[in-house]
């Protein structure tokens, strides 16, 4: 007990102004809630009747945390409890309530639902009180984590005692002491991670592993013991995490046990020790640094950890393990380089400079030296930093700065989770929600908070990065299934059929091919061993997909092109999510499957564990591209690196879309950001080459304008890019100034031709983009490069209506800043002209009619060309952009996608239902088109598409099946066509 805790602390001690209310509107709503609570709770009514820092604090806290507010409203006595009693005695009572809830009352063993209810009530109340004490700065983050950990210990212990007593009562085992069921039971529950270190975060799940000692003798038959304890653990998970009317206790994860894919939930001690001795990995050593017996037979748990000590802390200085420890870090944390750290959306646990880096800073050094230095064998991160200082491994300044950073980040983490009781470590990505976190931490505004956080993150990143200088392969464990000999094993064929394969003989033959070492990826003994271990999980995963045979054969095609396999097989065995993702690609996205079969390197990006949480923004992609190009040696090297980077990032954006991590509109924007960056890098490389060969052109300026889907941020995975290259120069110059000068036309024509070649020439590394320049002035008849003055003259004097429609989607994407600004001004001027509405209407209708005649849709799923499809929606937006100056619809804004243009231009002129239908259609077409273009080449036909793609399309359309989705497409397309006619035919 600390000195501070000898004095009873109360919430009424809260300092004035420790936090600020979120908004005045929220504050009014909170006071209304508090008044309702006060009707039944005199203490709350009395609080409201007066003026006090406590009243202001409670109101502010409830505006900042909807979760706390809802808890107080649902359990009206809860707030009275929190404001009326000393904090430590109250929390001690709640922990005791949880710990004792299993005990028989009047000789009757409580039923499981009663135990569950009492645990949930105690946990909920402790969470509420601890959060308020933390927000009030009466508790430190240390206090909060300790109380949460004590509640977790008590809850697990009570649940285990209840389960043991229940099993005793039903005759499944025989306890030694009914008053203390766990005592002498041999059932070991180890708390791992933050639970083991007594460092639980506010909405933490808990990691535990369960072992049992058969020699304890409470179950005679060891086979019965495995089955009974396994069943007991399933009930334990239910008791702890099932959501009921009373909430939940803790989300509980038992997957840190040995080989979780193939072992029971409770493992015999001897089997566990054999596993760790023979097959234990460095990540498991790191995990066991924090392990602590938290429930069950504590003495047996301590004995188990003593026996495991030589595995965790080796006697020699274990530098050899560091590369493998780094591989663990790679699994949890995405390398983000040294650019600016964006506070919004940052993961304070796993991101750069986050909590995990501090933990690994300590744990890595504990693993290196803990065998020789027993004082380093401590669980808590703060204690570990202190021990490392005592051992002279780090200096006092490092200890103090990292300790301070650790607890600050834990406070931030707690605030993130207190808002809505979500197990997240990611800061909000909006200013409004970030303000909530800043206020909860006592900052004046988000700027002050962001500056402090970035300072802390950079400090941690700096300290941590020095520890790791190399990476090695990851290792993995899985089950085993061996295919030997030349003949099929009958039992194996039955298993394959049971797993879901229609042609088990073919699948058996394919797998024997793998194990015979006929592919480069399976030529080494180690690779085949890893693949053998992986095979059961692999077959199970593919068997669960629709058309399992087809999907596995695509995987075989992928495998045949791999240069090596050990790392991949290890990763797939270690990472079920990665295996699931690979199966999804093989079963639903033939186009992606072909890409990774042809270019396996694109698969590397899937190993990034932050892949699904990192949104591929322009900054995100630019940072990665900068790193990837940084060591390029020459022009061709730059282009090859661009091709590799673009292929990988297109693939990774597609993977995010495929898994639902991002929506279609986000994918479109990401594909476009990628194209922008690649085109800019290619242009810069081309200009450097031109200047090296022919010198700069006096006054020369070049800019690239994106048209079509590139201009409107609507690219898909398979889109080409529509470009116009603009240039300008000094009129007095006759030629460029290099050793091989060129006249102006040849110079800028060659720049354009080189850019087109850089982007679209097929090479060993593939093609960047197919380039279409038909939207330049005079189309294919005109020069490939256009001087800015000629561009303006053409647009003002010669351009057709359809060319001005296309101009409404134009966007300057790279090049000389002043020329880009000149072009923007010209476009804005042209689009601000007042046109003859009737003529524009006639031209648009004629053009739509011509497209219908010359390019009829392939089927009802050809969303671009069907009546009421994407062209109709785009034409509505473009038509309104042209007549907008006459109708007063607002100025043109470059870079708007079609949905944004409709929102700005169509909403004021359309009936609300028609507008809603158009927006719904736009969303539906976008989602499905993005998925289809990602997964297959050519048109989508439900009768021929892979079964997995059918599921994805239905998911994208938010419909249960294809007939329902087809009906929705017909309804919306009909509404869009009606709106198109109403808007365009009637002149807006």
From Swiss-Prot:
Its cofactor is Mg(2+). Pfam families: GlnD_UR_UTase, GlnE. It comes from the Bacteria. GO terms for molecular function: [glutamate-ammonia-ligase] adenylyltransferase activity; [glutamine synthetase]-adenylyl-L-tyrosine phosphorylase activity; ATP binding; magnesium ion binding. One of its GO terms (cellular component) is cytosol. Keywords: ATP-binding, Magnesium, Multifunctional enzyme, Nucleotide-binding, Nucleotidyltransferase, Transferase. InterPro entries: GlnE (IPR023057), GlnE_rpt_dom (IPR005190), NT_sf (IPR043519), PII_UdlTrfase/GS_AdlTrfase (IPR013546). Residues 1-472 are annotated as: Adenylyl removase. It catalyses: [glutamine synthetase]-O(4)-(5'-adenylyl)-L-tyrosine + phosphate = [glutamine synthetase]-L-tyrosine + ADP; [glutamine synthetase]-L-tyrosine + ATP = [glutamine synthetase]-O(4)-(5'-adenylyl)-L-tyrosine + diphosphate. Residues 476-988 are annotated as: Adenylyl transferase. Its EC number is 2.7.7.89, 2.7.7.42. One of its GO terms (biological process) is regulation of glutamine family amino acid metabolic process. Involved in the regulation of glutamine synthetase GlnA, a key enzyme in the process to assimilate ammonia. When cellular nitrogen levels are high, the C-terminal adenylyl transferase (AT) inactivates GlnA by covalent transfer of an adenylyl group from ATP to specific tyrosine residue of GlnA, thus reducing its activity. Conversely, when nitrogen levels are low, the N-terminal adenylyl removase (AR) activates GlnA by removing the adenylyl group by phosphorolysis, increasing its activity. NCBIfam families: PRK11072.1, PRK14108.1. Belongs to the GlnE family. This is Bifunctional glutamine synthetase adenylyltransferase/adenylyl-removing enzyme. It comes from Agrobacterium fabrum (strain C58 / ATCC 33970).
């Amino acid at each position: 007990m600390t000195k501070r805790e000898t004095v009873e602390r109360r919430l009424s001690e809260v300092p004035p102004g420790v936090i600020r209310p979120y908004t005045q509107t929220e504050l009014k709503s909170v006071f209304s809630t508090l008044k309702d609570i006060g009707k039944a709770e005199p203490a709350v009514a009395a609080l409201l009747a007066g003026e006090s820092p406590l009243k202001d604090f409670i109101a502010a806290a409830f505006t900042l945390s909807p979760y706390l507010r809802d808890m107080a409203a649902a359990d009206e006595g809860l707030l009275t409890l929190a404001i009326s009693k000393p904090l430590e005695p109250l929390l001690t009572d709640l922990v005791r309530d949880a710990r004792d809830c299993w005990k028989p009352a009047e000789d009757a063993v409580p039923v499981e639902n009663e135990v569950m209810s009492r645990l949930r009530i105690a946990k909920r109340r402790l969470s509420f009180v601890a959060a308020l004490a933390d927000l009030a700065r009466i508790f430190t983050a240390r206090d909060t984590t300790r109380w949460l950990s004590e509640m977790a210990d008590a809850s697990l212990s009570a649940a285990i005692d209840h389960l043991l007593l229940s099993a005793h009562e039903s005759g499944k085992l025989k306890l030694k002491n009914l008053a203390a069921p766990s005592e002498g039971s041999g059932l070991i529950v180890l708390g791992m991670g933050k639970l083991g270190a007594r460092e639980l975060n506010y909405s933490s799940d808990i990691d535990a592993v369960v072992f049992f000692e058969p020699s304890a003798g409470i179950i005679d038959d060891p086979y019965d013991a495995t089955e009974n304890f396994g069943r007991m653990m399933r009930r334990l998970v239910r008791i702890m995490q099932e959501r009921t009317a009373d909430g939940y206790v803790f989300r509980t994860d038992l997957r840190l046990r040995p080989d979780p894919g193939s072992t029971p939930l409770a493992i015999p001690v001897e089997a566990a020790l054999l596993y760790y001795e023979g097959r234990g990995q460095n990540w498991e050593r790191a995990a066991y640094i924090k392990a602590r017996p938290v429930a069950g037979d504590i003495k047996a748990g301590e004995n188990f950890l003593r026996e495991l000590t030589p595995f965790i802390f080796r006697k020699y200085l274990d530098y050899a393990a560091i590369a493998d420890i780094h591989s663990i870090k790679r699994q949890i944390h995405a390398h983000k380089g040294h650019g600016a750290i964006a506070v919004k959306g940052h993961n304070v646990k796993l991101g750069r400079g986050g909590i995990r880096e501090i933990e690994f800073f300590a744990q890595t050094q504990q693993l290196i030296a803990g065998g020789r230095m027993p004082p380093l064998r401590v669980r808590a991160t703060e204690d570990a930093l202190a021990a490392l200082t005592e051992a002279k491994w780090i200096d006092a300044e490092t200890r103090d700065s990292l300790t301070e950073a650790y607890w600050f980040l834990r406070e931030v983490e707690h605030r993130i989770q207190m808002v809505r009781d979500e197990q997240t470590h990611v800061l909000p990505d909006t200013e409004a929600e970030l303000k909530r976190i800043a206020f909860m931490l006592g900052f004046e505004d988000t700027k002050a908070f962001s500056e402090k956080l970035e300072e802390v993150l950079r400090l941690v990143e700096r300290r941590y990065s020095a520890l790791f200088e190399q990476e090695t392969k990851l290792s993995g464990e899985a089950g085993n299934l061996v295919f030997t000999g030349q003949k099929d094993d009958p039992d194996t064929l039955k298993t394959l059929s049971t797993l879901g394969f229609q042609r088990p003989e073919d699948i058996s033959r394919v797998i024997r091919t793998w194990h015979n070492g006929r592919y480069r990826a399976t030529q080494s003994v180690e690779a085949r061993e890893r693949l053998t271990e992986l095979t059961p999980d692999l077959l199970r995963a593919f068997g669960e997909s629709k058309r399992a045979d087809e999907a596995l054969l695509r995987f075989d095609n992928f495998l045949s092109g791999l240069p090596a396999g050990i790392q991949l097989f290890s990763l797939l065995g270690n990472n079920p999510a990665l295996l699931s993702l690979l199966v999804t690609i093989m079963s639903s996205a033939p186009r992606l499957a072909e890409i990774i079969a042809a270019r396996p390197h694109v698969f590397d990006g899937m190993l990034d564990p932050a892949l699904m949480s990192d949104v591929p923004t322009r900054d995100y992609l630019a940072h990665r591209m900068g790193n990837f190009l940084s060591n390029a040696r020459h022009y061709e090297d730059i282009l090859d690196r661009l091709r590799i980077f673009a292929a990988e990032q297109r693939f990774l954006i597609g993977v995010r879309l495929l898994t639902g991590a991002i929506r279609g509109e986000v994918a479109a924007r990401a594909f476009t950001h990628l194209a922008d960056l690649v085109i800019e890098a290619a242009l810069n490389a081309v200009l450097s080459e031109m200047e090296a060969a022919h010198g700069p052109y006096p006054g020369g300026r070049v800019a690239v304008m994106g048209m079509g889907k590139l201009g409107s941020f609507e690219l898909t995975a398979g889109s080409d890019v529509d470009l116009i290259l603009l240039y300008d120069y000094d009129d007095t110059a006759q030629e460029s100034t290099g050793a091989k000068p060129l006249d102006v036309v040849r110079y800028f024509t060659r720049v354009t031709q080189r850019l087109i070649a850089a982007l679209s020439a097929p090479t060993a590394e593939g093609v960047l983009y197919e380039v279409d320049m038909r939207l330049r002035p005079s189309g294919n008849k005109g020069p490939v490069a256009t001087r800015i003055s000629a561009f303006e003259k053409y647009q003002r004097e010669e351009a057709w209506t359809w060319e001005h429609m296309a101009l409404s989607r134009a966007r300057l994407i790279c090049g000389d800043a002043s020329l880009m600004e000149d072009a923007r001004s010209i476009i804005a001027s042209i689009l601000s002209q007042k046109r003859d509405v009737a003529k524009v209407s006639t031209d648009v209708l004629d053009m739509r009619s011509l497209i219908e005649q010359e390019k009829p849709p392939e089927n009802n799923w050809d969303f671009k060309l069907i009546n009421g499809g994407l062209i109709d929606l785009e034409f509505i937006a473009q038509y309104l952009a042209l007549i907008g100056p006459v109708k007063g619809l607002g100025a043109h804004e470059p870079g708007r996608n079609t949905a944004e243009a409709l929102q700005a231009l169509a909403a004021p002129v359309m009936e609300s239902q028609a507008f809603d239908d158009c927006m719904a259609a736009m969303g539906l077409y976008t989602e499905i088109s993005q998925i289809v273009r990602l997964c297959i080449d050519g048109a989508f036909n439900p009768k021929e598409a892979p079964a997995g793609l059918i599921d994805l399309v239905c998911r994208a359309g938010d419909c249960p099946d294809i007939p329902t989705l087809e009906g929705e497409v017909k309804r919306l397309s009909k509404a869009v066509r009606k709106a198109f006619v109403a808007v365009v035919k009637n002149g807006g």
